[in-house]
UniProtKB/Swiss-Prot annotation:
Its EC number is 6.1.1.6. It comes from the Bacteria. It catalyses: tRNA(Lys) + L-lysine + ATP = L-lysyl-tRNA(Lys) + AMP + diphosphate. This is Lysine--tRNA ligase. It is an enzyme of class 6 (ligase). The keyword ATP-binding applies. Its cofactor is Mg(2+). It comes from Neisseria gonorrhoeae (strain ATCC 700825 / FA 1090). The gene is lysS. InterPro entries: Aa-tRNA-synt_II, aa-tRNA-synth_II, aa-tRNA-synth_II/BPL/LPL, Lys-tRNA-ligase_II, Lys-tRNA-ligase_II_N, Lys-tRNA-synth_II_C, NA-bd_OB-fold, NA-bd_OB_tRNA. It is found in: Cytoplasm. Binds 3 Mg(2+) ions per subunit. Mg(2+) 2 binds at E421. Keywords: Aminoacyl-tRNA synthetase, ATP-binding, Cytoplasm, Ligase, Magnesium, Metal-binding, Nucleotide-binding, Protein biosynthesis.
């Protein structure tokens, strides 16, 4: 395609005028034939053709006259004398079409010249190379399969407005190859995680999305109402308690990749509905869960990036080396070596320091809660390379098993990478009497004004009374994992349709 030939453009009309003009074209088509035919059968994809024939020379390819049927959206269109060129885009990539009055009838050529960018077409022909070496389909027949009534974004500027990208993701996917690649990678990451779990002999399961009692995490739920039963229901904030019921039932290794919902604020790291994997393994503990989380993340990075040493926001992240492990206090002192043990166990000093770092005071007044709040304010954001923070206080870990050797602490971890939480796991509490007491403590906190404290789940206690084996469990945020592995800074860029305020 010669560079001095300029693409055809519609008249300089505003969007409403363009839509009206295109509707008129559609009405003309309707009068002549079916405007939305569904009998074109393609046999080729653009990327497959480029891979198979792109490196073959013109002299070798042209005599083969390889027949193809290809379909896609018209992204470029140029006229050169009596010939026309177009570029169409399918899910795999782009390929050029060439039409002239030797290959197609003048009637077909005239029809084609009235089609617009964005129209979806099906073309049949043979492959050849242009003088510039571009793989091209010499068209023998072409059909309009679906008329685009709205103009595409300018091909040079693309779709640059962020809010429009999120609200009209369908346009973003058409116009921006980077966005398409992000969501292809997202799918590959999820498939990588799923394959890894199956390889570890885990069973994939599905548990309820609507719960009679919200549980499995400390968060505010969305509330709905079941009309037939006349009861309130809650969109799940986590699948944990149902998955552990399955472990009680003898399904010793289970996992679920699905949505959870939390009725809380939105930010670059938070969307009200989000995807996570949770997995549970009988006769296991938090040490095994840390290794599982590490292996899952490292394997996913290798799958989509070819390496576990990646770059995020211009800075290297080492997912290849063993992940560091620190306690909450060790992490605080690593970045604040001037803090003393005496200060870190002084409730009043902790409260002042928490406020100084811009954090809210926790609803629970215990030392452990205060230490955790200080960690979030002064250390969490500095954990760049993957780091497990271990041994969380009992008061902030109502479902985790208490440590046998460390008074007031649990066998719990959270994984932080690039300054944000990516995973949470623990040795599961399997003593039903201890669990019942912790639920009661959570109810007391809720009565005292903590909206995120847990409810008392009597059925879960009943399940535990049948015997929950020693179990390890872990949850990994899929959206944040995709952000990490695609080098994107906001969660909205990795969710196809993020939550938005209505227009």
């Amino acid at each position: 395609m010669s560079e001095q030939n300029h693409p055809q453009t519609e008249p300089q009309l505003d969007e409403n005028q363009i839509i009206a003009l295109r509707r008129e074209k559609l009405n003309n088509i309707r009068q002549q034939r079916n405007a939305y035919p569904n009998d074109f059968k393609r046999d080729s994809f653009a990327a497959d053709l480029q891979a198979q024939y792109g490196e073959i020379g013109k002299e070798e390819l042209d005599p083969q006259a390889v027949p193809v049927k290809i379909a896609g959206r018209m992204m470029l269109k140029r006229q050169m004398g009596k010939a026309s060129f177009a570029t169409i885009q399918d899910v795999t990539g782009q390929i050029q079409l060439y039409l002239n009055n030797k290959g197609v009838s003048q009637e077909v050529l005239d029809d084609f010249n009235h089609w617009d960018l964005g129209d979806i077409v099906g073309a049949e022909g043979t492959l050849f190379k242009t003088n510039h070496g571009e793989l091209t389909v010499r068209v023998s027949d072409i059909r309009l399969l679906s008329k685009s009534l709205r103009p595409l974004p300018d091909k040079h500027k693309g779709l640059s407005d962020q809010e429009t990208k999120y609200r009209q993701r369908y346009v973003d996917l058409i116009a921006n190859e980077e966005s398409r690649n992000t969501f292809i990678k997202r799918s590959q990451i999820i498939q990588s995680v799923r394959n890894f779990m199956v390889g570890e002999h885990y069973l994939e399961v599905e548990t309820p999305m609507m719960h009679p009692i919200p549980g499995g995490a400390t968060a505010k739920p969305f509330v709905t109402h079941h009309n037939a039963l006349d009861i309130p229901l809650y969109l799940r904030i986590a699948p944990e308690l149902y998955l552990k019921r399955l472990v009680v039932g003898g399904l010793e290794r289970v996992f679920e990749i699905n949505r959870s919902f939390r009725n809380e604020g939105m930010s670059v790291r938070h969307n009200p509905e989000f995807t996570m994997i949770e997995f549970y393994e009988a006769f296991s503990d938090y040490e095994r869960m840390m290794q599982m989380a590490e292996d899952i993340i490292r394997n996913a990075s290798r799958t989509v990036n070819g390496t576990a040493n990646i770059t995020y926001n211009g800075k290297e992240v080492d997912l290849e080396s063993p992940f560091e492990r620190l306690t909450i206090l060790e992490a605080i002192k690593k970045y604040n070596p001037h803090y003393t043990d005496e200060q870190l166990n002084d409730a009043e000093w902790l409260k002042k320091e928490i406020v100084k770092h811009g954090e809210s005071l926790p609803p629970s007044p215990g030392i452990g809660s205060l230490q955790l709040a200080l960690f979030e304010g002064c250390a969490e954001g500095k954990l760049w390379n993957p780091t497990f923070i271990v041994d969380y206080p009992v008061e902030v870990s109502p479902l985790a098993r208490a440590s046998d050797t460390k008074q007031g602490l649990t066998e719990r971890f959270e994984l932080f990478v690039v300054g944000r939480e990516l995973a949470n796991g623990y040795s599961e509490l399997n003593d039903p009497e201890d669990q019942a007491e912790r639920f009661k403590s959570q109810v007391a906190q809720k009565d005292a004004g903590d909206d995120e404290a847990m409810h008392y789940d009597a059925d879960y206690i009943r399940a535990m009374e049948f015997g929950l084996p020693p179990t390890g469990g872990c949850g990994i945020g899929i959206d944040r994992l995709v952000m990490l592995l695609t080098d994107l800074q906001t969660i909205r860029d990795v969710i196809l349709f993020p939550q938005m305020r209505p227009e």
